[in-house]
Amino acid sequence: MIKSLEIIKEKTHEECSKLLLKLISNHINEFEKFSIGLSGGTTPELFYKLFAKKYHEYSNITFWTVDERHVDTTEIISNQKMINSIFNDTKLNMIKYDYNEDPRLSAENYTTKVLEKINKFNIAVLGVGDDGHVASLFPNTRALESDKKGFVENEVNILTKWRITSTYQLLADVESLYLFVTGENKKEVIQKIGNEDDLPVNKLIGLRKKTTLLTDQ
């Protein structure tokens, strides 16, 4: 077990979502300005709904997405579209992903926008795929080799050919990083998280001083 991994277990997905909101609220109360990286997928949807219900004003919070499918943010499979639809608030201070036909330019542009607007990466919430991927750092893909701090294009051929993903170096720089992994279908990968398996999630954990896994399994 990687020593820098903290594991918190709750009985249900709902309890995990409520605890995550409590933990992040404690962080938000400590800072005048705050940044939080959000993920797509179905796992964090309840947490986002609870967050939106608790906070009605976001002027001191800057949101960014840890990865994005290489599509316009009006497309149904866009992570930012999903997040914005849940918050249903035009005042949400989300650093917008601008689609360019060239995924490399899209990644470079988002890197510039995020690094210009965020001086300190306070929190990020990440899921973990069945194959151990985090953000869009999938096993056996080129993005795993990047040594830059920012975002890079990554060819994955899952739903879309390309993804734009935060790099290990950016995620390693986040002060408090939560792996939010729930559901019966995640039992197998949860057993591998924090062990010496050659998975992207474990490489990320190894790069950080502390990572928190929140799960119901």
Language model: regions and residue ranges:
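ATP/nucleoside-binding phosphotransfer catalytic cores, i.e., glycine-rich phosphate-binding loops
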Residues: 173-217
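Ligand-binding beta-strand-loop-alpha-helix segment within the catalytic cores
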Residues: 1-4, 58-125
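A short secondary-structure junction signal
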Residues: 107, 135-140, 189-193
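Glycine-rich N-terminal segment of FAD-binding domains in flavoprotein oxidoreductases
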Residues: 32-52
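N-terminal glycine-/serine-/threonine-rich phosphate-binding loop
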Residues: 1-36
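A glycine- and small-aliphatic-rich helix-loop capping segment at beta-alpha/alpha-beta transitions
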Residues: 50-58, 84, 139-147
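Class I SAM-dependent methyltransferase SAM-binding "motif I" and its flanking Rossmann-like core
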Residues: 124-126, 130-169
